[in-house]
Amino acid sequence: MTNDIDWYTTLHNYAGYMRALKKKGTKTYCINPVYNDTAEYMKSEWVAVNPGTDTAVMAAMIYELEVTGEADHAFLDKYTAGWKEFRAYLMGDEDGVKKTPEWAAKISGIKAETIKALAHDLKAHRTMLMIGWGIQRIDYGEQFHWMLVTLAAALGQIGLPGGGFGTSYHYSSGGAPLANGPFVGGIPSKVDPIRPVKPWQGSKVLHVAAITDALEHPGAVRDFDGKKETYPHFRMIMWAGGNPFAHHPDTFRLERAWKKPDTVVVTDVVWTATARHADIVLPACTLLEHNDISVIGTNSCDGVVAMHQAIKPQYESRSDYWIYSQLAKKLGFEKEFTEGRTEMQWIEKIYNDARGMSDVYDITMPDFKTFWDKGFYLYDVPEAARQYVSFAEFRADPQANKLNTESGLIQLYSPKIAGYKYDDCRGHAMYFKPAEGTASATKEYPLALMAPKGRYRMHSQLDCVNNRQRGKIEDREPVWINPKDAASRKIVSGDVVLVKSRRGAMLAGAIVTERVKPGVIVVQHGAWFDPKKTPKGRIDVEGNSNSLTIDKPTSKLARGNVSSTGNVEVTKWTDELPPVMVFVQPRRKL
């Protein structure tokens, strides 16, 4: 996990807590196919699990706690709903298969004795289960989180200092104490009374992971979170604030579907892979070229910062607000969109809206001019926030502090979800075999792909700037490969290799390392898609991991993306290297 990123600005104040944890000498485990940077820093004990099988391991750990009498039934009885139904799954009453450590060992690649020892070690000590946001981007990704909460409940430490579980420590100062002050908002995202020019057909809002499927199948109906959604017939795409040609699985399939609409418009500050697939590009200013305002720390809310314009807009770029105000004007609803405010007037309003809540926090925020001239305002951190324990109030009195669940308790079994009768997400957490992974290895595609976030990027942002060279090999995205897998393929560090799946192929630069388990490769997510014709066919020559991944929903419940799932093969590249051109400005059609 990393903590160097945020939706807004950040003080990186959580890093101090990680340093303190290391200094204290607290034992940590890294249960991951990859020995990541956090594990390296903490010198964690590595439990190298097969990709997508963590859920089976946790089920087996709960089984071990239950059959040895160590599951905390006092906690389960008082604070959870559905243990009886989940236990039936655990003991094989549903499918005839007991979820024993031996069962999980065959799936996960972890020895049964290791699973047993891990379960007892977690029970014997005050244990915090910490996860990032990559694990849900696998097939059946919802199950991991549900099973993790179930494991935490069986351990019985939820609501105790240093115990329980947490899900957002990897970014935005997650885990840092919450400061005493209002969160700074933004321009409202819902503008009334704007309505479609023509009667709308299909769902008005789609989850972003549906984009390819929706473009391919207009009018199709899909199950989603207990409801039905109908894909509209997209005639035009207007994309801002994202780079689907980096973040969406099976990029070559997306490329084909992207051609179906009549017109594609992209607003961005750089020539991303997505901008290169647009008919019209509206060049937006960078943060240096216009004024803005931001909270400091998404999770910690440390204060407010004035983002002063440093230089005038370069070339033909304009601020996003100017671009959309002008479009609204052309469409006849400028007043409804702008509410009669300039960009600077919106910034002042946003600040004053927050300042208007000062009394709630018993603080006195400066007037806007004082704030803007100084450039920032920091909130104090109360001692109570430094001592905050997640779910402590719930543990103290679950009836007075009900959770936002069906029962008000920790929902181990959900009658609501069970009522959907989905075959890929039942009423409780359970293990499903991923569509691709270690267990699905074939002679043609024997390796499992992992695609974690890149160390030098935020998703695909910053791949185009000079610091990309800090990690590239021959201008290609690195691929981590275990020495055993590299030796059998006569690959050494520094070689350019071809990585191929059933869906596509890409070039990458080999890094031979023990930090990835045998049978698994790692290509960090976020390289820019750069397809070229080569003697080996049309391939991505820069190394976008999603050129390889499978595009299917996690399940009918969340329909999330599975951008870290795929079977691949790696071979040494012996042909002439095609140049990487995705960072070179394309020629414009005038």
Task: Give the residues covered by each predicted segment.
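Extended redox/cofactor-interaction regions of prokaryotic respiratory oxidoreductases
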Residues: 1-20, 24-31, 55-59, 153-276, ...
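Long, well-ordered, tryptophan-enriched scaffold segments
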Residues: 22-25, 29, 34-124
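Flexible glycine/proline-rich, aromatic-decorated loop/lid segments
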Residues: 34-37, 272-307
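Short beta-alpha connecting loops at secondary-structure transitions
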Residues: 42-49, 285-292, 302-313, 466
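Active-site phosphate/pyrophosphate-binding segments
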Residues: 61, 81-216
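Acidic/polar loop patches that form or flank catalytic/metal-binding clefts of enzymes
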Residues: 72-73, 115, 129, 157-167, ...
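A glycine-rich phosphate-binding loop feature that marks nucleotide/adenosyl-phosphate handling sites
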Residues: 78-80, 121, 164-175, 340-354, ...
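Long, contiguous, secondary-structure-rich segments that constitute the structural scaffold
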Residues: 310, 320-371, 460, 466-480, ...
